[in-house]
Amino acid sequence: MKIKAPDALLAAEVSRRGLMKTTAIGGLALASNALTLPFTRLSHAADTPAPASEKVVWSACTVNCGSRCPLRMHVVDGAIKYVETDNTGDDNYDGLHQVRACLRGRSMRRRVYNPDRLKYPMKRVGKRGEGKFEQISWEEALDTIASNMQRLIKEYGNESIYLNYGTGTLGGTLTRSWPPGKTLIARLMNCCGGYLNHYGDYSSAQIAAGLNYTYGGWADGNSPSDIENSQLVVLFGNNPGETRMSGGGVTYYLEQARQKSNARMIIIDPRYTDTGAGREDEWIPIRPGTDAALVSGLAWVMITENLVDQPFLDKYCVGYDEKTLPAGAPANGHYKAYILGQGTDGIAKTPEWASTITGIPRERIVKLAREIATAKPAYISQGWGPQRHANGEIATRAISMLAILTGNVGINGGNSGAREGSYSLPFERMPTLENSVETSISMFMWTDAIERGPEMTALRDGVRGKDKLDVPIKMIWNYAGNCLINQHSEINRAHEILQDDKKCEMIVVIDCHMTSSAKYADILLPDCTASEQMDFALDASCGNMSYVIFADQAIKPRFECKTIYEMTSELAKRLGVEEQFTEGRTQEGWMRYLYEQSRKAIPDLPDFDTFRQQGIYKQRDPQGHHVAYKAFREDPQANPLTTPSGKIEIYSQDLAKIAATWELPEGDVIDPLPIYTPGFENYNDPLTAKYPLQLTGFHYKSRVHSTYGNVDVLKAACRQEMWINPIDARKRGIANGDRIRIFNDRGEVHIEAKVTPRMMPGVVALGEGAWYNPDASRVDQAGSINVLTTQRPSPLAKGNPSHTNLVQVEKL
């Protein structure tokens, strides 16, 4: 397709054939270059006869990708020689299919034997962040932690102790690292009076908050297997081809279901993702942060052409038009009035209006509206990229309106407009007791809680459980997480706050590797990998099949590493709560106890020792496809939603109250309706005169956030690069592979450029999770996007707006 500036932004209808032709040469070049990877050599090992001393042990990849895949460790003489994946089941997603790990999980051996493994306890001897440590004994490390924790609780109270966000072992049971209230650290702290909790998460803070006011609670979605009943699939910023790419993830279901239904698939995203890769029917590029404007333009077409499902809106919804508008709301405060320009702003949300904001041609908006409205049923889904913006909460509510307006909620082949859902087994988790501290903050506001804790209030900063914080954070537990620095926004600000050890006086990091965050520890404890201990792995997003993995111990712990259960049990002994913490059980004892509890709810589970040999237990949803809100759709009176009205709330009275009472900075908007609001650092911000490019992030296939970010073969196979459109590159004299600088007022990153038509003009992208590697001037040399992101939170969730950034790019 021919693109001419300055109309490039409006040339947004991209055919699959045209894009594949454009990118074919680059793809062939990549396939034929001289990069040598040892995957082939390793795979041949599986074909050779197994030595007599070899044993195969079931293990798991427990990271935060949505899958949690089984791994089969081939162990010889106490060492892992190679890794395979699930060999049970078949290729048919109608049955108990195989759950095949991706290259990340299959490279687990390289994590276990990585040169940067933490070997023994250490204490800091330099400044935080310098990575200067000296070895100490376990006794000294645990004594130091226990005595400092007791001192800080005595001086500041339990509210001063914070459990930081960490998802490195999210899929574990005893080793589980998130949410904080479900971890062994939480159990230990609850035995000692509690801790300052957090709500929300870096993955989905805004969508969780926003759609709570639409559907009540966490917004569910149909399983991707149900796409076999769909005529059309529309994905807003949903990229399972990279975010959930293994056999336990969504890509497998998406493709197999579409083969049955022959459903068209349209991807709406600033970047042409691997979920497309020639499998989609159309890619529609869109400016980041403008999804709600597109939805408003689509809604205008649907309403004016009488394409909405009026009976559904009348029966199941609140606030679509004057008939269902709640008492006390403004007379023109309903959604239909907003779209038609009869609301307070007086602007009709026509396709022309939406086109100037989104960069999508008017004609394509009109066509898309008709396609969505007339496809019966349509599977409309949003990933978690669109919500990770300054206006993310309101954008998520807007995207869900497409499913609501067309009556696709609660039926086979439809969806709620949220991310895809899945079936899960009721497996018992580790009990963590009750937290006596009721106060919590947003997971994104912890640096502020260090810097200005007593100034933080409920109405201004989202403090929950009381009107304000009484004390700042004085101690941080950082278990299996890289959010002290690497995964938290505005790294340079976080560095300045953490480096002052008079503010937060004690930081304990528990990890397997010397991560970017580990360098900020006062006490650094070496954890065991999943291969070096026994646990259950679960919580996979796997369509209409769920499973539990027996992740057994394949090898002995390396060096002086201990399990998290050993560490916390030893600390409990020093703190005088050992009996309450352990209840007399070892790690295996807890596993046997939890397993027997689980068998009460899942009677088909085999006995413990049989399951240990079996390695994985799979079970299909007895209802067939998971259909979100099916019971509500069938009988809304008997099965109301958990919203105040019991219905889908297009107009939220609760949001109206929040909008009237919360203290918001200029530019932040909370509204009872799913309107379009640009948010800060938007495409039309005056700041674009200085920083003209929008920078967005994405989940890169070589890592799960930052996990696996230190594996050499994955880094070589999937190089960290900044994606930039040829139009923007040409203006700056940038060629593919050139070293460039990306910068704004928050920091600077040096990285190589990937010049590609797979990016929308005016937008650049960096895969999140690259390990922060600053030089002496604090210029990052690894492509860590959070050097450039902001710590200003989103309005409602107080979440991370990681994809809302303005930058400039120059060739070095």
Can you name each region flagged by the protein language model?
Residues A331-R452:
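Active-site phosphate/pyrophosphate-binding segments
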Residues K260, R271-A375:
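Long, well-ordered, tryptophan-enriched scaffold segments
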Residues K2-L307, G333, A458, K466, ...:
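N-terminal export/assembly segments and adjacent metallocofactor-ligating motifs
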Residues E505-M506, Q553-A572:
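Phosphate/diphosphate-binding loops
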Residues K2-K4, P180-I268, T275, A293, ...:
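Extended redox/cofactor-interaction regions of prokaryotic respiratory oxidoreductases
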Residues G166-T167, K315-V318, I372, N415-P426, ...:
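A glycine-rich phosphate-binding loop feature that marks nucleotide/adenosyl-phosphate handling sites
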Residues I564-Q614, S706-Y708, D712-W723, I727-L812:
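Long, contiguous, secondary-structure-rich segments that constitute the structural scaffold
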Residues E280-I286, S546-P557:
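Short beta-alpha connecting loops at secondary-structure transitions
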